[in-house]
């Protein structure tokens, strides 16, 4: 079975951008989950954070992926801190496919993208990932001035399961990325790929 590694800047980015790639052979690395450094031993003192983690575990129980959360401050990611962490997880998982977020107006997404580019470079001591894909975020559609997403790879998605899983993350649901919008985007990607509903990706590297 193919091993997939998804690097998600925040909890829920993976559901929005590459739900079709998530299964029991998938490992998700969450770069951060809060705007402050977290002592996970004392998480119960933060009801909002506890809710977020409980929601994540509900989704994990449904989709059966493995995950790790890095203790970085959301909105304050530092590329020099992320590169060694990404190299570590790539070497640990040795994935067949790596998924990274599209760079966008969101500063965290840009930093994660740039750090991932460095971490996946050909290197004597690091594992070389042969297939690297960039996934999109529906909230980026309003403005393409930074990076115009042009999908060149498509995968069939069970859109009802995607929406159902996303709604388990109640604290993260927003009006500008609601179920109808997710379905509409999946329909557009489906039209582009002759599928009913699909997710689109940019191929950054594909080595056979």
List the model feature ranges, each with a label:
Residues 1-93, 122-125:
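Active-site rim/loop-helix segments in enzyme catalytic domains that contact anionic ligands
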Residues 1-5, 24-27, 65, 76-208:
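Metal-dependent de-N-acetylase/amidase catalytic core
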């Amino acid at each position: 079975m193919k091993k997939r590694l998804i690097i998600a800047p925040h909890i829920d980015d993976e559901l929005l951008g590459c739900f079709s790639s998530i299964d029991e052979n998938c490992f998700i690395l969450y770069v951060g989950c809060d705007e402050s450094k977290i002592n996970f031993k004392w998480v119960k003192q933060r009801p909002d954070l506890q809710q977020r983690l409980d929601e994540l575990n509900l989704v994990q129980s449904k989709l059966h992926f493995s995950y790790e959360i890095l203790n970085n401050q959301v909105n304050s990611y530092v590329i020099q801190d992320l590169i060694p962490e990404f190299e570590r997880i790539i070497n640990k998982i040795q994935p067949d496919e790596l998924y990274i977020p599209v760079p966008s107006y969101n500063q965290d997404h840009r930093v994660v993208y740039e750090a991932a580019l460095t971490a996946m470079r050909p290197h004597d001591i690091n594992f070389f990932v042969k297939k690297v894909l960039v996934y999109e975020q529906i909230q980026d559609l309003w403005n393409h001035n930074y990076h115009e997403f042009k999908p060149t790879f498509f995968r069939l998605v069970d859109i009802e399961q995607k929406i159902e899983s996303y709604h388990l993350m109640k604290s993260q649901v927003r009006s500008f990325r609601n179920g109808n919008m997710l379905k509409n985007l999946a329909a557009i990607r489906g039209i582009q790929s002759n599928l009913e509903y699909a997710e689109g990706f940019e191929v950054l590297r594909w080595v056979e």
